[in-house]
């Protein structure tokens, strides 16, 4: 018989830097999960992606065991890294903060492809370009 899922927790944690401190500790603690065990596993799995924020979905089962799935970093973080900026524009329609090339957008789209509900790289590119526009980043040909 399959184990019964009693909770799903979605977090965004810096790669390789999960600690029992908030937000990780309280989110896992209320479901009775072994917090240190999760932190060690997550840090080991994401050690090669240092500096990125990794979304993770943790499924907690009735016997307090858990499984987790890591996703690709959010598009906004990848765009900021590609453009070399710390912060997106507060007024994206009037203030443009950076420009990125179409090649960079394609690179990000290919990286994000497993997590996007896009059928082709072109449609994924338009999603990434839309995110860039809403951040005040210009996409040039």
Curated annotation (Swiss-Prot):
The keyword Transferase appears for this protein: no
Entry keyword annotation includes tRNA processing: no
GO molecular function per UniProt: large ribosomal subunit rRNA binding; structural constituent of ribosome
UniProt keyword list: Methylation, Ribonucleoprotein, Ribosomal protein, RNA-binding, rRNA-binding
Modification(s) after translation: One or more lysine residues are methylated.
Function (record text): Forms part of the ribosomal stalk which helps the ribosome interact with GTP-bound translation factors.
PANTHER family, per database record: 60S RIBOSOMAL PROTEIN L12, LARGE RIBOSOMAL SUBUNIT PROTEIN UL11M
Assembly notes: Part of the ribosomal stalk of the 50S ribosomal subunit. Interacts with L10 and the large rRNA to form the base of the stalk. L10 forms an elongated spine to which L12 dimers bind in a sequential fashion forming a multimeric L10(L12)X complex.
Name of this protein: Large ribosomal subunit protein uL11
Lineage: Bacteria, Bacillati, Bacillota, Clostridia, Peptostreptococcales
């Amino acid at each position: 018989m399959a184990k019964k899922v009693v909770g799903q927790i979605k977090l965004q944690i810096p790669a390789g830097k999960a600690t029992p401190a908030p937000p990780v500790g309280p989110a896992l603690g209320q479901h009775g999960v072994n917090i240190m065990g999760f932190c060690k596993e997550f840090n080991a799995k994401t050690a090669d992606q240092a500096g990125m924020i990794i979304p993770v979905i943790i499924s907690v089962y009735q016997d307090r065991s858990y499984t987790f799935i890591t996703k690709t970093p959010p598009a906004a973080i990848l765009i900021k890294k590609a453009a070399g900026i710390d912060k997106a524009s507060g007024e994206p329609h009037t203030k443009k903060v950076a420009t990125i090339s179409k090649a960079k957008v394609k690179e990000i789209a290919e990286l994000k492809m497993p997590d996007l509900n896009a059928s082709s790289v072109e449609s994924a590119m338009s999603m990434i370009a839309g995110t860039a526009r809403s951040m005040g980043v210009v996409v040039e040909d």
